[in-house]
Amino acid sequence: MQSGVKVSPVNMEERAKLGLKAGDKPMDLVFHGGSGSLLTEIRESLDYGVVKMNIDTDTQYAFTRPVIDHAFKNYDGVLKIDGEVGNKKAYDPRAWGKLAEAGMAARIVKACEDLRSTGTTLNK
């Protein structure tokens, strides 16, 4: 999924060069608009000192997509039409909520892998 915001590792490289007297990566950079970026762009940005990447759009989509899939697959059970009661198993939030949580969890795992943070800790 591509968003309207694109990362520009070249800009990050130029910013990092401004502080070369302070070391190779003189600034901790935040990657705003990281959702939809290519893995190569993410990795290149990390090499220039990015320590945080915002993926709000990706995580919102990862949470919402399974809910919509569930609603479409269980359309007749989710809706109460013309006085019918529907199917409680279809519209119970515990059913579609688990799917949403699993979608979010999978996206967070992917983000950790993309950002090279899997298996690391801040408190070494």
Residue ranges of model-derived segments:
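Glycine-rich phosphate-binding active-site loops on the catalytic face of alpha/beta enzymes
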Residues: 48-66
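Alpha-helix-loop-beta-strand connector modules within alpha/beta enzyme cores
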Residues: 1-29
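Short low-complexity, flexible loop/linker segments enriched in glycine and/or proline
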Residues: 67-71
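Hydrophobic faces of well-ordered beta-strands that scaffold small-molecule active sites
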Residues: 27-33, 51-55
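Catalytic cores of alpha/beta
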Residues: 34-48
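Generic structural signal for well-ordered alpha-helices
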Residues: 8-12, 42, 108-112
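Glycine-rich beta-alpha junction loops
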Residues: 33-37, 57-60
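Extended, intrinsically disordered, low-complexity segments
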Residues: 72-124
